[in-house]
């Protein structure tokens, strides 16, 4: 046989530990933000060590044999030094960048989350149809008509900047003579509803829209769609989405002026489909990946109106006055707050008052992302973060995505379906967001030039000597030395004016920690492997988007190859409801 020593290991950084320490603070009515980072980190380290000790003794009592006197912990000084060294390989190669783009964001934890830190749950949300008045168009019939958008995130309407259409989608201008006008007439809106109002909508979705708005009056039994609304006249206009180029609408809250008085252009989006909704998609570059890319390509930038805790900025125009009255309090709730988005909430109330709310119901069932730790809903939020690019050309050829996809084909997966699972995830994933706005973790050890833009040459300091000083200090003192007084001057050394540089205090995604284990366990330990490659990685199927995934990306980025030859995936023992058993769910 062959010697296969078991090296016990623990991931020690991250949100689960912080969450427990913060719970202790809350019981004592302490504010975490008032505690110095070094003190908070010391408490997190002590908490993690306590449970490392408890679990070690429990596993030994079970008769599990391993190198208990020499485990690996991601919070050990040498581990933290290696993790930083691996990060600096990305930085020095030009494969680390700072950018602003929508990322998964937890308003409860006030940090960005990776896909592996998100769980999807079935929920019921508010769905609304909103009318945007068309003010300009090369098609005369559209001027004065209303474009209809559908959304399940009413809270994003105050930061709408455009409307997307599908170039190949068939659209119609429907004469709304009875149903919705009748609906609006009982809402106290300010817009006159007498006479016919024309609504622009994708033809394949008109029936669905009419069902959603409970408009059965305008239909003729057995008649074609062209007779909806007005039994005498056909649609006022019918055409392809590509005909809508140059069309402009105005925001339903345009009366507020400022941001809301700006025109809302119609933009072509290849992501617009007729699967659901209205075939017209409201665009907010702050809160959606497609929105961000399409708007930025057309000169529309994020406005950063939603803060880290999920509330609109106090100076945002939609909030208006009345900080202390009920009107003001209602608008200062977190956007994930259910009443905030309800048909009776502030968004819908304002749209109803403007005569723009065509339907509102809180009965839409769908799958929605939640934080794996707090179990609270997450949002897409545009924030400055640090990323590893998936599609940038790497030295030696290929991209991180193409390298990983190639290595996935070489690795043996047991069962075989694991290859397809991880492959589909890598193939479609966005750039890897590495930064977290938390305290307990390996710091993202970067310095950036004051006053420079992320796109400027020299924005990020890529000096191997500076990086070596950081790694040497971490090896003997641990990552806490990054937070010590005078750390910036110490690490920059005599070659740089510390006043010209800013020190980054974000921490690394914990999946980068665990993804680096091949370096500080397999490569660096005396009992590791000669080539730094594991014969087998074995974990549950959830790790196709976790440890297997991050390890593959990390190793392909620094070594150009997979860190393992075989991946074995096991199943889970489930509870009586079919849920995975875990301490956080309380079902173990």
Predicted regions, residues:
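Residue patterns forming the tRNA-binding/recognition surfaces of aminoacyl-tRNA synthetases
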Residues: 2, 18-158, 177-178, 183-189, ...
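Carboxylate/His-rich catalytic cores and anion/metal-binding grooves
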Residues: 4-15, 171-173, 180-186, 193-251, ...
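Conserved phosphate-binding loops in nucleotide/dinucleotide-binding enzymes
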Residues: 121, 283-286, 499-506, 528, ...
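Glycine-rich (often Gly-Gly/Gly-Pro-rich) flexible segments and glycine-rich loop motifs
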Residues: 182, 195-197, 201-205, 210-224, ...
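Alpha-helical support elements that line or immediately flank enzyme active sites
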Residues: 289-296, 550-559
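Catalytic cores of enzymes that engage adenine nucleotides and/or redox cofactors via long glycine-rich
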Residues: 425-430, 438-447, 485-489, 502-511, ...
């Amino acid at each position: 046989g062959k010697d296969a020593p078991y090296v016990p290991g623990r991931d020690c950084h991250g949100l689960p530990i912080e969450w427990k320490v913060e719970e202790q603070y809350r019981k004592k009515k302490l504010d975490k933000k008032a505690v110095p980072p070094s003190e908070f980190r010391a408490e997190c380290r002590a908490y993690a060590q306590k449970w490392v000790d408890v679990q070690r003794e429990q596993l030994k009592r079970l008769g599990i044999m391993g190198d208990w006197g020499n485990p690996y912990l991601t919070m050990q000084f040498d581990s933290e030094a290696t993790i930083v060294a691996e990060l600096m390989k990305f930085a020095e190669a030009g494969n680390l960048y700072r950018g602003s783009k929508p990322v998964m964001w937890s308003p409860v934890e006030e940090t960005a989350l990776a896909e592996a830190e998100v769980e999807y749950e079935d929920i019921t949300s508010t769905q609304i149809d909103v009318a945007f008045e068309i003010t300009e168009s090369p098609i005369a019939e559209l001027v004065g008509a209303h474009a209809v958008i559908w959304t399940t995130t009413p809270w994003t309407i105050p930061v709408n900047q455009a409307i997307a259409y599908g170039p190949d989608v068939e659209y119609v201008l429907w004469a709304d003579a009875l149903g919705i006008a009748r609906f609006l007439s009982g809402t106290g809106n300010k817009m006159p509803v007498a006479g016919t109002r024309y609504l622009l909508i994708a033809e394949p979705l008109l029936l669905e829209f009419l069902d959603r708005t409970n408009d059965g009056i305008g239909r003729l039994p057995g008649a074609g769609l062209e007779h909806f609304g007005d039994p005498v006249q056909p649609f006022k206009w019918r055409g392809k989405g590509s005909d809508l180029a140059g069309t402009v609408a105005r925001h339903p809250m345009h009366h507020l002026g400022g941001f809301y008085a700006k025109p809302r252009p119609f933009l072509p989006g290849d992501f617009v489909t007729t699967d659901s909704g209205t075939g017209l998609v409201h665009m907010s570059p702050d809160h959606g990946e497609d929105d961000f890319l399409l708007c930025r390509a057309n000169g529309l930038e994020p406005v950063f109106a939603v803060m880290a805790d999920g509330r609109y900025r106090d100076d945002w125009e939609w909030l208006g006055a009345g900080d202390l009255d009920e009107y003001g309090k209602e608008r200062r709730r977190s956007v994930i707050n259910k009443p905030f988005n309800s048909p009776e909430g502030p968004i819908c109330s304002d749209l109803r008052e403007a005569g723009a709310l065509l339907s509102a119901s809180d009965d839409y069932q769908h799958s929605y992302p939640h934080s794996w730790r707090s179990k609270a809903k997450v949002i897409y939020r545009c924030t400055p973060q640090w990323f590893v690019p998936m599609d940038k050309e790497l030295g030696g050829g290929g991209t991180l995505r193409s390298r990983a996809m190639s290595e996935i084909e070489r690795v043996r997966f047991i069962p075989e379906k694991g290859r397809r699972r991880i492959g589909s995830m890598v193939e479609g994933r966005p750039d890897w967001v590495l930064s977290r706005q938390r305290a307990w973790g390996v710091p993202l050890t970067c310095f950036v030039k004051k006053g420079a833009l992320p796109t400027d040459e020299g924005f990020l300091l890529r000096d191997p000597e500076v990086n070596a000083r950081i790694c040497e200090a971490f090896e003997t003192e641990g990552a806490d030395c990054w937070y010590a007084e005078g750390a910036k001057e110490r690490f920059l050394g005599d070659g740089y004016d510390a006043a010209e540089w800013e020190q980054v205090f974000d921490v690394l995604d914990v999946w980068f920690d665990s993804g680096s284990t091949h370096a500080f366990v397999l490569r660096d330990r005396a009992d590791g492997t000669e080539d730094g490659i594991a014969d087998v990685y074995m974990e549950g199927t959830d790790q196709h988007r976790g440890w297997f995934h991050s390890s593959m990306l990390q190793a392909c980025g620094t070594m150009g190859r997979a860190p393992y030859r075989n991946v074995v995936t096991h199943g889970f023992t489930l509870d009586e409801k079919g849920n995975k058993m875990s301490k956080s769910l309380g079902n173990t």
